[in-house]
């Protein structure tokens, strides 16, 4: 019987499962190299932790790792039901809240190593967390893609720790009761991007699709389709970072000016940025709440010990 110690939380509605113990040791000097080893040699563990019957398609995993740099508090590898993430904003907030629960982090600023590079996270006295994300930038503006059944869709391609296609010009209603139609629309966009070989810089796969509309209580509301075809319940930290990169490139948001991003569920992140080189350094503020401190059991006799995978 294998045992995996996890801490579950949610950040603005989006769940994170922090894996503390029970995983095989990963080889590699950097967090990116450890992520490669996880992907190439231990992916069954991702499936066991993320897929049914222990997980679900909305869940994001965060593997706690020793840091690669001497001044970092820890390292982390993010993953979900379909694969691995370079960075995850809501997951970093969940990581910090969970480590605080375990007594491993105190209020203050902490450096965290991720596959996409180092980030810093400030745990505030009231429990909120501000993540200073990786360098973010817009790669291309108003890119047309022909989407079967929907016509030509224009969107910006931007990096916020993952690759995003950001669409503001659309006829969709961003409400919870319209999630099925929103999922169909954004999935069709993602498939069209792949079919037409539209990518991020250096061929990076655009695996997040983000729609925007006006919101009465925030600067914007979004709907984010994640790589595994689930939608983000939170406003999406890396997606908000990509949005800020586009706003900055268009001269619509000044450095230090706060942008309030609402999710499809109504939860909110506060964000601002600093200019850095040809891009920006975004900061995202949100809050996570703990939901479980548990031990997952993996019984080798169980036919679904390593998850129920789609064919």
Curated annotation (Swiss-Prot):
List of residues binding substrate: 89-90, 208, 232, 237-238
EC number(s) given by UniProt: 5.1.1.8
Domain of life: Bacteria
GO molecular function terms listed in the Swiss-Prot or TrEMBL record: 4-hydroxyproline epimerase activity
Keyword annotations: Isomerase
Catalytic residues of the enzyme: 88 (proton acceptor), 236 (proton donor)
Catalytic activity annotation: trans-4-hydroxy-L-proline = cis-4-hydroxy-D-proline
Entry similarity comment: Belongs to the proline racemase family.
Family matches, as PANTHER family: TRANS-3-HYDROXY-L-PROLINE DEHYDRATASE
Function as written in the Swiss-Prot or TrEMBL entry: Catalyzes the epimerization of trans-4-hydroxy-L-proline (t4LHyp) to cis-4-hydroxy-D-proline (c4DHyp). Is likely involved in a degradation pathway that converts t4LHyp to alpha-ketoglutarate. Displays no proline racemase activity.
Protein name: 4-hydroxyproline 2-epimerase
Organism: Chromohalobacter salexigens (strain ATCC BAA-138 / DSM 3043 / CIP 106854 / NCIMB 13768 / 1H11)
Species classification: Bacteria, Pseudomonadati, Pseudomonadota, Gammaproteobacteria, Oceanospirillales
């Amino acid at each position: 019987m294998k045992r995996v110690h996890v801490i579950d939380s949610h950040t603005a509605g989006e769940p994170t499962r922090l894996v503390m113990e029970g995983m095989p040791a990963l080889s590699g000097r950097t967090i990116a190299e450890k992520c490669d080893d996880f992907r190439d040699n231990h992916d069954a563990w991702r499936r066991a932790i993320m897929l049914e019957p222990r997980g679900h398609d909305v869940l994001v995993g965060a593997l706690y790792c020793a840091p690669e740099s001497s001044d970092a508090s820890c390292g982390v590898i993010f993953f979900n039901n379909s694969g691995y993430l370079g960075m995850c904003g809501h997951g970093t907030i969940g990581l910090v809240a969970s480590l605080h629960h375990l007594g491993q982090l105190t209020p203050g600023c902490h450096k965290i190593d991720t596959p996409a590079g180092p980030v810093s996270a400030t745990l505030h006295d009231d429990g909120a967390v501000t993540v200073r994300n990786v360098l973010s930038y817009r790669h291309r503006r108003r890119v047309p893609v022909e989407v079967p059944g929907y016509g030509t869709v224009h969107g910006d391609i931007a990096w916020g720790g993952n690759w995003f296609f950001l669409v503001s010009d659309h006829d969709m209603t961003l409400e919870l009761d319209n999630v099925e139609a929103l999922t169909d629309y954004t999935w069709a966009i993602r498939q069209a991007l792949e079919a037409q070989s539209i990518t991020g810089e250096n061929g990076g796969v655009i695996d997040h699709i983000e729609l925007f509309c006006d919101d009465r209580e925030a600067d914007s509301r979004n709907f984010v389709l994640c790589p595994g075809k689930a939608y983000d319940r939170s406003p999406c930290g890396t997606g908000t970072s990509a949005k800020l990169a586009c706003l900055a490139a268009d001269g619509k948001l000044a450095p230090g000016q706060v942008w309030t991003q609402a999710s499809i569920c109504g939860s909110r992140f506060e964000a601002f940025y600093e200019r850095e080189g040809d891009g920006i350094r975004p900061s995202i503020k949100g809050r996570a709440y703990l939901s479980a401190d548990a031990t997952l059991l993996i019984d080798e006799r169980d036919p679904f010990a390593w998850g129920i995978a789609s064919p």
